[in-house]
Design a protein with these regions (language model features):
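Extracytoplasmic metal-acquisition and chelation regions
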Residues: 2-353, 358-361, 365-366
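Structural signal for glycine-centered tight turns and loop->strand junctions in beta-sheet-rich domains
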Residues: 368-370
Length: 370
């Protein structure tokens, strides 16, 4: 065969082989692209909520307003795949109701699918979040809480303690049957352990409506967590501090004290400037003396200046309780805090004290502090 013909055939063979390789490679590339598009499509599935916002069925980013809500939420979502929970105000050591949103806070909320708050007007920035991020689903955990304390109720109790007791009792019962406006409610609802359980249930219920595939898991987690919380509530019920009269210098503590049956004189202070006016101090001291009030309660992180001033004038003892507003981010953080409070409240009833005509008299050290 002519050498030129052989050379030509060799060149044609090389060209044909190259073309085949190019075609085969292109098919593999297209196949990979199609497969990738399918996977991306599956990972970006969404579900519509009642308000029209879309939540990913694969990953849900939840942001909580502050620490107590964070602890509730991690318990409700425990073991649910694809759910990420973060706390917006993670560096906050006190109450959220005087909090101002930072740029970093807004960035966190911007990335959220769900924002969970206390409700009852505790978070003053709630409307701002709704306005800026209308597609973020907001869960009001306090939506169906039943044990609320109103400011009006406190005023009536403090002003009329020794007058018209039967009339006040009837009025308080009527107040409970009427709807209380947000501005009148003490919003620190989580400090009543029964309220806390209701908040946990509400979070689970609303998350189940958003993430239907995990609805049963959310409710199961809530039920298991609430069983542990019920044990704390039962311990408080058995403690029975009914009839004990006390002063609370931190309004969030009032929920826990009243849950335990205590008769509380609540003194509301400005969170930015906690100094009490001379008039308030004078009235409080007189009321404490008239009613033999021997217990003053403050938060574990609060300044004790006001408490010591009242204690020095009345001989009352100071007790520090944990408001569960910060902690170690553990699942049982709230339970540990409430058990600690239980031990302290037990001391109110037992520590070097005795009961006389329904009143409690306590001996205390030179610092007037437990």
């Amino acid at each position: 065969m002519d050498k030129n013909i052989i050379k030509l055939l060799t060149i044609l063979l090389i060209i044909i082989t190259t073309i085949c390789l190019i075609i085969f490679s292109g098919n593999k590339t297209n196949e990979s692209k199609i497969k990738g598009n399918i996977e991306n499509s599956e990972n970006s599935k969404t579900t519509n909520t009642d308000d029209g916002s879309k939540i990913s069925e694969k990953n849900i980013n939840i942001v909580t307003s502050f620490y107590p809500i964070y602890v509730m939420t991690i318990n409700v979502t425990n073991g649910v795949y694809g759910v990420n929970v973060s706390n917006m105000s993670e560096n906050l050591k006190g109450c959220i109701h005087d909090y101002t949103l930072s740029t970093d806070d807004l960035k966190k909320v911007e990335k959220a699918d769900v924002f969970i708050e206390t409700g009852e007007n505790l978070e003053p920035f709630s409307n701002k979040i709704k306005s800026i991020y209308p597609n973020v689903k907001i869960i009001d955990s306090g939506k169906n809480v039943s044990n609320l304390i109103s400011e009006e109720e406190n005023e009536n109790k403090n002003e009329n303690k020794n007058e018209n007791k039967n009339e006040n009792k009837d009025k308080n019962e009527n107040d409970k049957s009427e709807e209380t406006s947000e501005s009148e409610v003490n919003p620190h609802i989580w400090m009543n352990t029964k309220n806390y359980c209701e908040q946990v249930t509400e979070i689970a219920k609303q998350l189940g409506e958003i993430d239907i595939n995990n609805k049963e898991k959310y409710m199961e987690n809530a039920e298991n967590y609430n069983k542990k919380l019920d044990e704390i509530s039962n311990k408080f019920s058995e403690l029975n501090l009914s009839g004990v009269r006390a002063v609370s210098l931190d309004e969030q503590l009032e929920y826990l004290l009243r849950q335990n049956g205590m008769d509380v004189i609540s003194i509301e202070t400005d969170h930015e400037n906690s100094a009490l006016s001379a008039d308030v101090v004078s009235k409080t001291i007189n009321e404490m003396k008239e009613n033999n009030v021997k217990a003053i309660f403050i938060d574990k992180d609060s300044d004790d200046k006001n408490a010591k001033m009242l204690a020095n004038e009345t001989g009352a003892r100071i007790y520090r309780l944990n408001s569960a507003m910060n902690g170690d981010n553990s699942y049982d953080s709230y339970i540990k805090d409430m058990n600690q409070n239980y031990e302290i409240l037990k001391q109110v009833k037992e520590y070097n004290g005795r009961w006389v005509d329904g009143q409690m008299w306590i001996t205390f050290n030179e610092n007037n502090e437990f």
